[in-house]
């Protein structure tokens, strides 16, 4: 019997992602919907690396990923107490994730495997805030482009996370 495939940030170490994912799974259980959280990892290939190069010069990507990551690492290095608290927090996130998210797919490595495995789902659903942000909308995972036409695509509480999208990003 086919089931629903859920694309969610269940293992991201922030409260919003984990609580949204958990609330979604609780609601699916309440409605007796058979589901599993889809686990997908990009296969690093020369083509993927080549496609990623323009993103390194994208101001949104630079701000969202590079600058924020650098600032966080610098703060943790300069303030050892913050690093200790962060380690405790990350441990709590890991335990929450391990205890709450049991219905997981096998890990699908690479886009081709993700597309192939999507055939086992009646529907795929994306659920969490800001998964369609300009820096991530083109991933073809959270926008559900991997699923074929016969698979129902559902968005639950998904947003762009910005109030305006640049013209060059508006064609999705």
State where each predicted segment sits.
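Conserved small/polar residues in nucleotide/adenosyl-binding loops
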Residues: 171
């Amino acid at each position: 019997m086919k089931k629903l495939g859920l694309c969610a940030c269940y293992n991201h170490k922030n409260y919003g992602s984990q609580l949204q994912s958990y609330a979604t799974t609780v609601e699916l259980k309440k409605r007796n919907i058979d589901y599993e959280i889809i686990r997908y990892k990009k296969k690093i290939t020369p083509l993927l690396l080549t496609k990623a190069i323009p993103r390194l010069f994208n101001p949104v990507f630079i701000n969202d990923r590079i600058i924020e990551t650098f600032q966080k690492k610098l703060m943790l290095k300069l303030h050892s107490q913050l690093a200790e608290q962060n380690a405790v927090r990350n441990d709590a996130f890991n335990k929450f994730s391990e205890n709450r998210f049991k219905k997981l797919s096998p890990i699908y490595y690479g886009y081709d495997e993700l597309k192939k495995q999507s055939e086992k789902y009646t529907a795929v659903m994306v659920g969490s805030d800001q998964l369609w942000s300009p820096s991530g909308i083109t991933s073809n995972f959270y926008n559900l482009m991997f699923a074929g036409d016969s698979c129902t695509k559902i968005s639950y509480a998904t947003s762009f996370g910005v109030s305006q999208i640049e013209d060059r990003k508006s064609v999705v």
